[in-house]
Amino acid sequence: MAYQTALTIESVIKDIDSKKYLLPSIQREFVWSTKQIEKLFDSLMMDYPINAFLFWKVPKEKAKEFSFYEFIRDYHQRTGRHNPKANISGVDDIMAILDGQQRMTSLYIGLKGSYAYKTSHKRWDNPQAYPSRKLYLNILGESEDTDLTYNLLHSDYFRSKFHQKIYQKYYYFHKTQHIYQYQHIHRQDFL
């Protein structure tokens, strides 16, 4: 069994973006909840290992014998739960993910994508019932309330007076939204 060096989160995100990593048709669909995504990021922020990924290198000559799918980038509970089929024409060897799809998809959704799930007390056929949520991370310090440290929120969240107080006290919810778009900024710069 061959072992590779550790992957960086940045390289995983870039490889998903460039479609270097694809999912074989034998993979189940993305099923993680927002709480599971938050726990993954909690583990990362506490420097816990998140286990290994299992890759399957498929030579381009064999790739046409299989079906492959792309990663979900913006999960939507009603209209975006299925992975789009990958166009593999003109592609070199394919790196298929056999184990780690839930974690990789969660990393992508948490850092660049979004997660839309139905708001309670709204009709399933109402498009407004599925606000798009992004992950906000407190990378500057400890929160007094651990439930506020990581959370997938939609933009209407801070409209109530109670949530305005939280926003003022924990301003990093909004401020860190775009931090991962800048490659030259690192977590250590803020510590």
Describe each model-derived feature in a short phrase:
Residues 2-34, 38-191:
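Basic- and aromatic-enriched surface patches that contact anionic nucleotides/nucleic acids
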